[in-house]
Amino acid sequence: MTRCDDRPSASQISITHVTQGSCVASASPNEVYATILGSCICTCMCDPVAGVGGMNHFLLPSADVEDAQHLRYGSHAMELLINALLKLGAARQRIEAKIFGGAMMTPQLGAIGQANAAFARRYLRDEGIRCTAHSLGGNRARRIRFWPKTGRVQQMFLGSEDVVPNEQPQFRLQGGAGDVTFFDRHNNAEMPDPIKEPR
C-alpha cells in the first residue's frame, strides 16, 4: 500500500517514556513522548514554526509555594526544557506550552499537586510563554502522549485499576503546538474537549 501523505507509519514511530525528573526534546516527526502523571506536572512545549518540541516531568519537593529552594527546582526543570528547544532552533518568543497533571492522588502528598499546577501556570505567565491549553487537578492519574514536531497532545484519564508510578518529591533532575485530544480510559472514545483556556 502506498501512503498518500508524509506521516510516519506505526513501525517508524519511536515512543520515549518520560519519567519523573526527566527532560527531553526533539525535532523528529517519528518521535512521541509518553508519560503517566499523578501529582506531578508535565510541560509540553513546542515552537510550531521551527517544528521542535519537548517535555519535562517534575514534582516540587513540597506544597510550600513560597519556599525559594523548592521553586528553584521547578524553575530549573522549565529552563532545561526551554534551553533544549533553543538548541534545536526554537525561538523563545514562538514557544507555546501545554501543561498537565497536578492531581491529588494520596493524602500523604497533600496539596502538592495543586502547588505544582500553580507553579507551572505562574512560571509560564511570568516568563511570557503562551499557555495554549491545560488540564490540571482532580483526583485521577493521566496518561499523556506528545508529538514534539507538531505540538499535538493526547490525554487519557486512568482508572483506579491502573498502575501509577510511585511519585516522590525530589530536588535533582535527571540529565542535563498542535491539537489536544482527550480520551476516556473506560470507553477509549474521544471526550468533549475539557481544555481550560488560561485567563
Curated annotation (Swiss-Prot):
Keywords, sorted A to Z: Chemotaxis, Hydrolase
Catalytic reactions on record: L-glutaminyl-[protein] + H2O = L-glutamyl-[protein] + NH4(+)
Gene3D superfamilies: 3.30.1330.200
Alphabetized GO MF terms: protein-glutamine glutaminase activity
EC number: 3.5.1.44
Highest taxon listed in the record's lineage: Bacteria
One GO BP: chemotaxis
Classification via CDD domains: CheD
Family of the protein in this entry: Belongs to the CheD family.
Function, in words: Probably deamidates glutamine residues to glutamate on methyl-accepting chemotaxis receptors (MCPs), playing an important role in chemotaxis.
HAMAP family per the UniProt record, alphabetical: CheD
Protein name in UniProt: Probable chemoreceptor glutamine deamidase CheD
Gene designation: cheD
